[in-house]
Structure formats: structure tokens, C-alpha cells
Amino acid sequence: MRVLFAVMTVATLLLPQQRGYSPIQDGDAHGDPPFLLEEGWEPLLNGTDLTGWKACDPAAKNEWYTARAVRFERHLGPTQLQGRQGAGGTMLNGPAGRTANLCTEKAFGDVELYLEFMLAKGSNSGVYLQGLYEVQIFDSWGSTEPMTTSDGGAVYHQWIGERGVGGSAPLVNAARRPGEWQSYQIWFRAPRFDASGKKIESARFERVLFNGQLVQRDVNLDGATRAALSIPEAAQHPLMLQGDHGPVAFRNIYARPLRPLIVR
């Protein structure tokens, strides 16, 4: 009986791939993180140090550090995160939560990205695909106001003529309370260029899941969002994590090549 149960369990785990399930979920699949369940994921943190990462601005003060663990104590300091500094798979943006923005040394084009993050109360960060297009990280937990392009899960707006333009508010408020680990899964399609270098298709967020809930679908990006790197749009650029807007911790950052979108 135990052998039969084991065989049935393995078969059940294999069924989704055998049935050709869509590589892009719309928030209807839950369980362990995708990098544990699916093939092709590349870790962007090595579990020891910050190899593979650098300050986006070489002249900026870089206080990012790795930690074995991170702690949030609401009654002692709700606006702070405390990391146990040393070799580990979590990274924090300095003791004060305000330091340089961090970039990968590797450049990415079309990519599927998964990452986990923790915020202190009222904190703010962002993940910039290609250093240009931001999915906002913000403490929106408990908000009952209509969602805006400044809330967690938003595609942040551009800044044109001293005002915010465009962007995309999240479809739902999926934020968890400060001090809890949260996750993004992002499907990003890079801009397209012709042989002369002229852009012929805008970049696009095909899907964004925030804590497993669908918050963005097919959002075209006419240009870089606010506070992006001062670089031109291109087929490939590094990933950027914002480090100068308040305490944030990151772990389990994985990437793999974007697969075709199959709507089921």
C-alpha cells in the first residue's frame, strides 16, 4: 500500500507538465515557490555573499550586506529590520535602510523573475527590470483606499514634465503586513528593435503575481519609469533593486528565460 501511494503521489506531481499546463499562471496555482517545482531557474544569490551584484552607481555608498536571518519587531522598532550579518542567502540594504541601488552584473532580456522580500512599516523599494521598468515594492498592507501606481504591486509611472504619467495600479491589494516575507513572480518581455536600432515594440509586463495573486496583466511600457537608471532602452540590461527608500530585505531571487505565453 505504501509503495502504491508513493507511485500515485509521484504521478500526481508529474501531471501538470504532462498535460501541458500554461507556463504563466494567473494566480490560480498555489504551493511551494516555482523554483522548487520547475526546471530552468538560475539563482541570483549564492547563499554566501553578494557575488554577482554591485552598486549601480560605482561612486555611491554601498552598505548592502548578507545575513543568515532577518528580524522585525513591531513593538521595538516597526520602521527597522535587523539582520544577523554574515554569510547567508538574505541581503539587506544597510543598517539604516538607505543606501545605493543594487544591480546584477548579468544583463537580462526576456525573463521570468521570482523574488521574495520583507519590508519594515512604511517602507518602500522597487524591482526594476532592465534597470528601467519598475514593479513597486511598498507597504500597502491594510490600505482601504483605491490602489494607485505608488502601491505595492503597481507598475510605477513615468515622470514627464514634472508629473507622473502612465503606470498601472495593481488589480488588488495583495500586500502582507510588515515583517512578513512576500513574493513577486514577474513575466517580462524586453523591447524589440530593428536592424537600425529603432524601437519597434515596447517592453511589456505580461503578468505579475504578488503573493500569488494576479496584480498586472499585459502592461505595455512606453518608456522608463521614474527613478530608473540613466541608460537607453535596449534588448538586455541588468536587474536593479532600489535601496534608498527604506529598510528592505531580499531572498530567493531566481530568473529563467521567458517562455511563450499560452492562455488556457
Tell me what each language-model feature is.
Residues 8-17:
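Hydrophobic h-region of N-terminal signal peptides that target proteins for export
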Residues 1-4:
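Positively charged n-region of N-terminal signal peptides that target proteins for export
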Residues 17-264:
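Carbohydrate-interacting regions of secretory-pathway proteins
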